[in-house]
Amino acid sequence: MSADILNAQHNDDTFENIWQELKWRGLVHVSTDEEALEKALSDEKLTFYTGYDPTAASLHLGHLVQLLVMRRLQLAGHYPLGLVGGFTGLIGDPRQTSERVLNSREVVAEWVQSLQSQIERFLSFEGENAARMVNNLDWGGQLSAIDFLRDIGKHFRVGTMVKKEIVAKRLNSEEGISYTEFSYQILQGLDYLELNRQYGCTLQTGGSDQWGNLTSGTELIRKVEGKTVHAIGTPLITNSDGTKFGKSEGNAIWLNPKMCSPYAFYQFWLNTADADVIDRLKVFTFLTRAEIGEYEHKVETEAYKREAQKRLAYEVTALVHGVEPTEQTIAASEALFGKGDFAALDESTLQTVMDELPSVELSSDRLDLITALTELGFASSKSEARRILKEGGASVNGVKVQGEDALISSEQLLHGKYAIVRRGKKNQGAITVV
């Protein structure tokens, strides 16, 4: 994220305090003592942390919720610690369904670097409350089995641990749960204890599905240090129709542009349902309560214009990928829907658009539209392709073509080797000349 975007971000000063804003935005599902936490956030400048385990090469939309909570707390004057789990990532937190595959130390170390780079883009590392990055391998990697059992494990009761929601589900499943994953909650509790000792950290934030792990830390600090510390669990974002948020055709929406292009990312947000878009604006943008209220009115009165979805898609894509790639993405989207010029797109953006379309490679001596339509599957035969062309039902790069012998000329090729072929209103495909 650019410095300009970071500098433009601010909390809504119409709220009494940051706690009230977090609650209004729907970012608090569960917490430790609410009254004490609100008072601490209002009266003190807390050091807080959020942990991210390197179980993949990129963060995804679920992590974006946590990153934005961190940024909102930082804007309120609190001190952020971004923890990447080079230690806990060697195990991975228990999943609801089955045991994780253990990744090699080399892969985990590589992913740690990748996640650190991503997290750093969402926080400010300048000023009085500059963010800091930490890696729990720094203390966990030095811990012997004896020290772990004597100094940490002694404070955990198995009866309490097995009641944690995910552990209980796994224990009742056919596969069960290994001691490795069962012990994960102890390791996360250790993180909070170490950060409390080293940095005076008194607040941890995370997803509500991690609540058992969060409270492992608060309880460990209470037993070992005799201190009361805080935790916030954010809700798991769900769609109004019951489908899982953060997935597109079953695939996670990653924050890394190499794993999910800015174009695909933008389209994901643009397709948000009317019933969900206001909640998404609250969680994923820095728009004020008044601004979001205006979009709520537009959804109620002019939903067909989809202005709220367009603003949401712009804000979140710019937040994650930057303003320039977002503007290129919007230009690409408009071109695909016949409202823009493909020739105005840079090659990188054009390629990301083509990745979303059916595509074929054709040699320079086969650039006739009959071949293009049949190879793309837009015509079942050459005779059908001729009929489509005769009726003017095809276009190249948004320009309608007609005539059975129509060719894609070298002048029409985008960046010297690409073309977008359309049949009718819905069928579009990409041609690459080889």
Positions of PLM-derived features:
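Short acidic loop-to-helix transition motifs that present clustered carboxylates
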Residues: Q188, N213, V401
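Predominant activation on well-ordered alpha-helical scaffold segments within soluble catalytic domains
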Residues: Q116, Y184-L187, L193-N196, T215-T218, ...
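NTP-dependent nucleotidyl-transfer catalytic core
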Residues: M1-Q210, T218, E225-H230, T243
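Generic alpha-helical propensity signal that fires on short helical segments
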Residues: A40, L64-L68, Q96-R100, L149-D151, ...
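Short alpha-helical patches at coil-to-helix transitions and adjacent helical residues
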Residues: H63-L67, Q142, N213-L214, K310, ...
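Conserved nucleotide- and phosphate/pyrophosphate-binding catalytic cores
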Residues: K223-V434
